[in-house]
Amino acid sequence: MTKAIQMQSTDCGSDLYDLMGEITYIIPVEDGDPNEASFLQGFARSLMDNAGIIQLINTLPSDIWELTPEGQKIRLARRMSGQASVTWRGQSPRALKRMVTPPFLPFIVLFLGREHESETYREWINAHSFPLTVVAEKGGTITYKEFSLEKLKESFLNVCDALVGQIKPDALDAAREHLRNWREPDERDLGYKVGGHNVVAPNLFSLYVAGFRDSTSGGFKKIDDGIAPYVDIIVQTTRSVLLERERIGERAANQYFRRPPSLSLFAPSIYPHFYETSLARSTFTSEEKKDILAVRRMLQRQDGYGFTIGNQRQIKAFLGGPEGDKPNPHPIILERGAELSLATQCVGTLSASELSAVIRLPNAANRTSGQVRQFVQHYHARHTTDRKRREAFRKVQSAITASVPVEFFEFIEGAKDGIRLISDAHLEWINVRGLPICVQKNITKVPVTPGNLFIEQVLPKKYIHLTTSDFEEVLILSALDKSDPISGFFDVALSAFEPHFRDKIRIREERIRNKEDLVAALNSYDGSLVIFDGHGGHEEDKPAVLQLLDESIDIWQLQRMRPRVPPVVVLSACDTHAADRNHATTANGFLAIGARTVLGSVFPIDARDAASFVARLLYRVAAFVPASHKMFNRSLNWLEIIGGMIRMQLLTDFCRRMESKGLIDRESYRAIHLVGNLAINGGDDWPYEAVVTELAKHGVDDKRAWHELRSAAANSTAISYLQLGCPETIIVHPDEGFRHEAQAKMEANQ
């Protein structure tokens, strides 16, 4: 648990600091320019070259207390609560040289790869008031050949010795005691071994943290037997991780430190434009073009976890020559392999930090883009019907669901604490027990392109701890002209709900004419929630835009301006994370400039529904969240808050549909809505099943109820809203009593 830094003065007037025990691992990134990134997914190539360093970091402690006998007793519980994450960062040399680490944060480990010259960083290393720990082939504190926990401990003890006179003596004594008490965790027997492969690497990192060290038997061999052998080892290791989580269980501290998702679905992807770029005017030779096209077709047609090679041209491109020759794969194949390795190690950092399970999906998930495109075209069509939209959604949902092996659904249905979708594919529409997963579970999505944004979003983060009073002022960025027909909907919706939250939330509205107004409004706001009210759009092959009063703006352009962005951004606008468009969405743009989580939309959203959604969200923060604190005696994370909102949206749309069709009357509407409300907000695993059961009491049979519910879902904004980023890392606590009680619970656990 992080504590505030405190100082005391010595007799000579110098200040002595407390000591922070967190360990931070740093990898220099000397090629951070996006124009130099890998062309299939957008990673810094130096990080791709150093994926092995990340693999090592994923096995290391998160702080100096974790490996003590006392720390090991609750190590796994702390990680499951997001309170002991492995922290590593890729930093450019320029950024490093501008930032000398203060003495109260001394446990820094700089990892230098083969291409890094230690002398490049010597001036920065020597600028510290303590000996920085540097791991390098030569010129560092520890070489890779001799690296071990014992060597790391020795280096940290030397750091403590150098901090005498800078850090409080009792803090140094405690740090030394922790370090001297480091013990390797007891090794445990998993009971089986698997062939090592990227598809199970994140799960193996989780199991490694839990003490299961000897879990592989060489490399994975069954690469020519279809997806079944891959699925088998994914299922096996996923089950082991989840059983370990079940063994540990919930702790009292989880009332305050809510657990992140127990399960992630991971589908690495490639920029769509890679497949669409013409080679006609390129400088490649005719043979080179044929090889590139062959590789593109292989990548595009990949269904499973490996490549299917269909002809001699593809064999030549894949192996670099005829079968039997020494393999010399095409540069694109090599680059894709390096991208996948880096992406896997980054997801492994997350799984090791949370003791969570990761299900790697076959590439079939990414091949559903054609069906998504058809549904998007239907959604945008001027003339459509309720039935046609339901049928169009059924088709795209069926395709996406079919791309997920059936063996994985037991874990998806049983997932606790939400599900994280690490994917560009629209996995949020997977059919789970008759409805899209986005209305059945609390979900958040981490985009996988561009690669450098993916890394920033997927790496573990310090939790943001808020209380309900941190939402006492909400900023609304208004970008609608008064003559716009939809400009009054926000006022109408807010005025209806304002009596319910006026004592707790104050609305601050800013009219946004241009980019400068937007940046000024953000910089002048120090609250936690900003809402954009206006129009959005995303044309094909262009960045998405928000329409301000005087101009359109691409949010990605604000990166160099570095505005202050609150942790939560809600975009009440159309197509802010549009389906069937490139990665340069407005929602991704807000993540890139610093938002912790963004609520975006994959389709156009009805202005009345959007205004009502925002008004109900403010009411939820003001009234439901405090009531939930009291009812369940625990805090809530933002993932739970918005997940409940989306489910309530579908419930309302469904009940209105049933009433409009004459299937229920007003009295039945109230009764059914109440049952659904209690099921959703009471934490029922499958609340809509409770609603269907209640409908039967009012004369609606199950078959008709489910038919109408699926139709309501296909036509509801509930399937358009999408949480992106890391909402699970924002925890909203009660205003009263949290800090003292949370500290007491944490100490009791320790």
Which residues fall in each region the model found?
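Structural motif
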Residues: 418, 528-529, 568
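Domain-scale, conserved, charged regions that form catalytic cores
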Residues: 2-478, 482-510, 514-517, 521-524, ...
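Active-site-proximal C-terminal subdomain of hydrolase catalytic domains
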Residues: 31, 37, 149-154, 160, ...
